[in-house]
Regions:
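Flexible, glycine/charged-enriched surface loops at secondary-structure junctions
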Residues: 129, 268-276
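Short glycine-rich, acidic/polar surface loops and turns
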Residues: 275-298
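Extreme N-terminal flexible tails
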Residues: 1-24, 28-84
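Short beta-strand-to-loop junctions in surface cap/lid or active-site-entrance loops
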Residues: 85-94
């Protein structure tokens, strides 16, 4: 990424904050770059353009309401009684962490829309019970400058917008080919002009470095979801080979449970398959998270199967977001049995 920081929303048992991910250390005392005017301008444009415009119009994503909800959640957190009950509940077991990464590929607009919807639901005090059983980390837009470019210049842009040395006419790295897991082995390109250009080395990009840092820093990540489109399929590791990983049965049964939760609650039918079954690619975030010990790591190719492609009609945004959210709430009960009643 050349111009902007990735940003994340991190919610843990009642508190939430927007943050810029740590980037290149210029000053040893502070590894974070604050949200500056340039970034804020980009975010404002993102939330007022393209598919998100429909959110604002229909009051699904109401910024004022979102801010108020976050404040309310913070009040809950600061209540001593709440703290005690949380401690009692989890004194035997470390809290599970769920990471949701959205918007790695610029043109897949439904992905950040769903990520944003999930963040909004988590900030709603009506859903505060969900924060009792897991720490949720939402990265609603991993590739902001690519996403912006897909609104302003090229609807089907996929990569980020970094300038590639020696080829100014061919910018961009495919973020989902840049992770250090079988990097550049298969399903990516060393040609900077290619849509699947994997970068000069693994983790050459700020965005992928930020995810690496997140996964390394946070212990006990139980579930990692990478939201993409399209295909209406839940893909499990391994993606770089068609060989099955150890523990494939568990990976598959959790993915089947997710798909069933979605369809049993009135949502679409999502297929489940191994990512590398028909097409192999190295350097993906799902395989990376899995290689770092995350037991349940998936890429969700959001709807539809083929007709809409990347151009999800705005009227379908809410339905897709709701079905993923419902499936996720139920899936929490499979990860943390005490949370089954939330389904
Ligand atoms: Zn994608």
């Amino acid at each position: 990424m050349s111009n902007y920081n990735s940003w994340g929303i991190h919610m843990r048992s009642g508190h939430c904050w927007h943050s810029s991910f740590p980037v290149k250390k210029k000053n040893k005392r502070s590894s974070k770059i604050p949200m500056n005017e340039k970034n804020l301008d980009l975010l404002n444009r993102i939330f007022k353009s393209g598919s998100e415009k429909e959110y604002i119009k229909s009051d699904i994503l109401n910024e004022r309401k979102f801010r108020k909800n976050v404040q309310d959640q913070n009040k809950i957190k600061s209540s001593p009684r709440q703290k005690t009950s949380k401690l009692d509940m989890h004194k035997k077991k470390e809290e599970s962490v769920i990471i949701i990464e959205a918007g790695a590929h610029a043109r897949e607009w439904i992905s950040p829309a769903v990520g944003t919807y999930i963040a909004q639901q988590l900030a709603d005090p009506a859903n505060s019970d969900l924060l009792k059983y897991a720490t949720w980390v939402v990265v609603p837009l991993l590739n902001p400058d690519g996403y912006d470019y897909s609104h302003t210049d090229d609807r089907f842009w996929r990569k980020n917008r970094r300038l590639n040395k020696g080829r100014p006419e061919c910018p961009g790295v495919d973020l989902n080919r840049n992770f250090n897991i079988k990097w550049a082995i298969t399903g990516s390109s060393s040609n900077q002009c290619s849509e699947t250009y994997h970068g000069t080395k693994a983790f050459s990009e700020k965005e992928t470095k930020a995810i690496r840092k997140l996964i390394k820093r946070i212990k006990n990540v139980e579930l990692y979801l990478s939201l993409h489109s399209y295909g209406q399929v839940i893909l499990h590791p391994l993606g770089y080979t068609s060989d099955e990983p150890p523990g494939v049965g568990e990976l598959r049964s959790m993915a089947d449970a997710f798909a069933n939760h979605i369809s049993n609650n009135g949502g679409r039918q999502y297929a489940v398959e191994q990512a590398g079954l028909n097409y192999q690619s190295g350097g993906g975030s799902d395989d990376y998270a899995f290689s770092r010990g995350v037991p349940y790591s998936y890429t969700v190719e959001l709807p539809d199967k083929w007709k809409d492609g990347f151009e999800t009609p705005p009227e379908k945004i809410l339905g897709i977001s709701q079905e993923i959210w419902t499936g996720l709430k139920c899936l929490l009960g499979d990860l943390v049995p005490d949370a089954k009643y939330l389904c």
